[in-house]
């Protein structure tokens, strides 16, 4: 039997995977194209959003600079090292903001308003639609600012950017982004059972700031939470330590991809469970 006449179950898995990957890549391009058209129609709003986003990033950096004017070191970290850590933390934060803004308002926009029914009617992954129906391109400035802070800190510390170190930067950046996405996806799934317009995202969102500083400034209990419960600290601190070549005890950098994989698996499992048990609001 030819491939064209074969049943879907008879198609080799690599071929089926390639077809699905190509299909979703095309859908992603379509989503982004549609988003770009909308933004071109509202350029003023986009510029205001970009300025507002950039101002928030600069405000956070200004706080760090003021802090180090008062104290030249923070738990043994100087300003260039802290800016490197701060800059790295902005990368997964920016990636999350670009791709997953819908998660923050999922309970209100999709569950309470009933838009999730429309999502489920389409023969496309519901999670894919939620993640990529909208983008926040203005959040790219956060990634750019983070890379600049890392470059400046590395330059002042005379850090040599070898191919291995660049590969580690990309690898840890992806892992950290997955951790951020997974944490908020886990929180988002609570909306399937507890209908609330605001949800539980805001207090956890504020915890992100704790991962932008050396974990050694916190108590052991707080460090545990930031590494294993809400691992924003693990996602930012230990990759920065590895990239800077600093020695810390314990060394948890090897656990970053493990935690990313575990949290992603939990998040996807909860999402699938939630969609299977979803009851329409009837809106």
State the predicted function of each range.
Residues 2-283:
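Hydrophobic transmembrane alpha-helices and immediately adjacent juxtamembrane helices
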């Amino acid at each position: 039997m030819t491939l064209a006449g074969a049943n879907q179950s008879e198609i080799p898995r690599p071929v089926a995977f390639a077809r699905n990957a190509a299909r979703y890549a095309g859908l992603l391009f379509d989503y982004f194209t549609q988003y770009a058209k909308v933004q071109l129609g509202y350029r003023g709003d986009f510029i205001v959003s970009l300025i507002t986003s950039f101002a928030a990033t600069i405000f956070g950096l200004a706080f760090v600079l003021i802090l180090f004017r008062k104290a030249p070191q923070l738990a043994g970290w100087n300003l260039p090292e802290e800016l490197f850590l701060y800059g790295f933390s902005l990368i997964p934060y920016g990636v999350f903001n670009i791709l997953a803004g819908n998660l923050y308002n999922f309970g209100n926009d999709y569950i309470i308003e009933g838009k999730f029914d429309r999502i489920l009617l389409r023969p496309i992954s519901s999670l894919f639609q939620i993640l990529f129906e909208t983008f926040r391109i203005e959040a790219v400035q956060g990634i750019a600012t983070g890379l600049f802070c890392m470059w400046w800190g590395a330059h002042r510390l005379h850090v040599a950017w070898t191919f291995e170190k660049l590969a580690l930067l990309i690898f840890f950046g992806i892992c950290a982004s997955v951790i951020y996405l997974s944490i908020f996806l886990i929180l988002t799934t609570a909306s399937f059972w507890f209908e609330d317009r605001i949800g539980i995202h805001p207090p956890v969102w504020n915890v992100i700031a704790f991962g932008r500083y050396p974990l050694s400034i916190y108590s052991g209990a707080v460090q545990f939470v930031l590494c294993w419960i809400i691992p924003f600290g693990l996602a930012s601190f230990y990759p920065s330590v590895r990239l800077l070549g600093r020695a810390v005890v314990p060394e948890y950098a090897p656990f970053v991809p493990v935690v990313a994989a575990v949290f992603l698996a939990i998040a996807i499992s909860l999402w699938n469970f939630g969609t299977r048990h979803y009851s329409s609001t009837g809106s």
